[in-house]
Amino acid sequence: MTARPKVRPGKRTNDPEGLRKRVLDVAEASFQARGYHASSLGDLMAAAGVTGGALHHHFPTKKALALAVIEERVAAAVEATWIAPVQAAGSAREGVRSVFEAVAAELEQQGFVRGCPLNNLAHELSLADPDLRAALAGIFSAWRQAIADKVRADQQAGRELDTDPQRFAALAVATYSGAMSMAKTAQDSGVLRDCLNALGQGASPASSSKGEAVAKRRRRVLRQYKAF
């Protein structure tokens, strides 16, 4: 009985992780440019150059693919664009301003506005599926929390003592989201700078105190009218 020659295992030619990344790249771009509902699996497979079997091995359903795009790509975009810069800034206000200005400058150089990746999908999918909505809401929550935590850090250093961290964070996120929606519609990144200036005026401690004073006067007037 002769010994069989040893056979070296052949070099692996397939790349599951590379394939998965390619599908995510294509899906992310299509969902942002065309929308989730307008992006068919057939179109995505053709653009990625994969078979149905290969696609479904990684993403059994279109919803699973959307969740992966949201949890891996959109969350990473918010982390890189917003959370990390705010955390690294000297203060929450400085961080928010730097993000607005950086995004506006990038859009001006780019020449077009595709919108906020999170905002785009939130508008389309929040009422379409509870799991997709929960994934999107989780990113919004982490975004607001990061800004609020930065305000609290400022307060520990003796700054922003008259600022409510959660309200400031909600206002910053809402202002940016709205500004990006308007900039996308108008194809004009200048809206971001306008909204940043308004945010600076409306979110300052002095403005907040003035607003509270106005609200108190309004309540007093209403009570006087009720007395008649």
What are these regions (language model features)?
Residues M1-R34, S39-A47, A64-L67:
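Basic, helix-initiating cap at the start of DNA-binding domains
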Residues A48-F59:
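Short hydrophobic/aromatic patch on the recognition helix
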